[in-house]
Regions:
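Intrinsically disordered, low-complexity repeat segments enriched in small/polar residues
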Residues: 8, 55-56, 155, 160
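Classical eukaryotic N-terminal signal peptides for Sec-dependent ER targeting/secretion
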Residues: 1-9
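Disordered, acidic Ser/Thr/Pro-rich linker "stalks" and the adjacent N-terminal cap
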Residues: 3, 14-96, 109-114, 177-178
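Trp- and acidic/polar-enriched beta-sheet ligand-binding modules for extracellular glycan
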Residues: 22-37, 44, 85-88, 110-178
């Protein structure tokens, strides 16, 4: 009887293990990984992240070293290395395709003590959702939210900073984080 129970348990364990690793489950995991952009930065310059409001935003002399989606190591000082938007304007980033993400990273200008009054929105097919609202944000931050399909991220400069009118971004990223 004990031997039969052992055999039954082993057969049951084998069937459960086989069912877990079925081709359907593996295919679903592969598709989900692709939809999540392989957990890479969807706003990366090389991934095709576009600043759609580039004509209305401000850059210092060299465009490439000032765009916040750049992949290279960057130097930031009072002359270059950042992008900013005026009061009541937005920095809008659009991707080549939609991705499922749950984390947005941004680095704000913080070489002088200042806090920013801004909002962050994500959208998919024109439906926008507020994911961050702050009257006193500073430095670099990760914004976590529920898994969602996203094709556009908008940083709205609601009130500028305590130092001036601008929302100054040094770096932006968006990705799926487990």
């Amino acid at each position: 009887m004990n031997f039969q129970n052992t055999i039954f348990f082993l057969v049951l364990l084998y069937n459960v293990q086989t069912a877990i690793e079925t081709p359907c489950t593996l295919r679903e995991q592969k598709i989900r990984k692709i939809l999540r952009g392989n957990s890479k930065n969807m706003l990366s310059f090389r991934s095709g992240g576009l600043l759609t409001t580039a004509r209305t935003n401000y850059y210092q002399p060299d465009f490439y070293s000032s765009i916040p989606t750049r992949d290279t190591i960057y130097i930031v000082n009072f002359s270059f290395g950042f992008t900013y938007s005026a009061l009541d304007q937005s920095l809008i980033f659009r991707t080549m395709q939609s991705y499922e993400i749950n984390t947005v990273f941004l680095s704000l200008w913080d070489y002088t003590y200042r806090t920013y009054n801004f909002q962050v929105f994500i959208s998919f097919n024109g439906t926008e959702k507020l994911i961050f609202d702050s009257l006193a944000a500073t430095g670099s931050m990760y914004i976590k939210f529920a898994d969602q399909q996203v094709d556009t991220i908008r940083y709205y400069n609601r009130g500028g900073s305590t130092d001036n009118f601008a929302l100054i971004l040094i770096k932006v990223e968006a990705f799926y984080k487990r």
